[in-house]
Amino acid sequence: FIKYGFTKQEVSKAFSSLKLPQGFSNSEGLIFPAQYSFPQGISAQSAAQSMIDRFSDDPNGRKLLQGNKDFSAKQLLTIASIVQAESTNEDFSKVARVIYNRLRIGMPLQMDSTVHFIMQARGDIFLSRKSTTLNSPYNTYRKFGLPPGPICSPSSDAIKATLEPIQGDWLYFITVAPGDTRFTASFDEFSSWKVEYTKNRKAGAFK
C-alpha cells in the first residue's frame, strides 16, 4: 500500500483526516483485513477511507459499531482484536468467553498478546516474567479491565465470536502444544497444563 504509489507522508496525512465511525478518534483496529484493489490515480485518502468503510460494510463489523448495553463499539473492537491476536478461528468464541468471564468478576485479563503489542512482538509464544511488568496502559497483567484501544485489526470471524461468544465458565486457556489449546475454569488444572507447555516449549515443540 505504501510501497507502490503513495509516500509515507501521503499515507500519514490520509489516515489523519479520515471520516471515522462515531466513538472513534483514530483508525486503529478499523482497517478491515481484506485484499484491496484500487484504481490507478486514486488518492491516498480515498484508498484509506475505503478500507475504513469496508469495516461497516461487513455484517459483523456493522453490528459491532452499534455497541451493546454492556460495551461501547470501541470496547467491543478492543475485545475482538485480543481474540484475533490470542487464538485461531476454531477457538475465537472460547477466548471471547474467557475475556468476558474475567471482566465480569474483575479479574485482570493477563493476555500475552497485549504485552506483545507493547513490545511489537506479535506472534511470539514466549512471554518473560519481566515483560509482564512493563508500565503501559496496554499491559493487561498490570492494568485491570480492557486496554485503551485495539491491538490489531480483527477479522469478521473474530468480531462475530466477540458478539456471539459460546457459553462456558472458562477463566484460563493455554496452548500446550501446536494445535492443542485447552480451556478450564480451574487454576490448578491450568497450572498443570502450564508445566506441560513449558516442557514442550523447551523440547522445541513450538519451533
Predicted segments, located by residue:
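Membrane-embedded segments
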Residues: 1-2
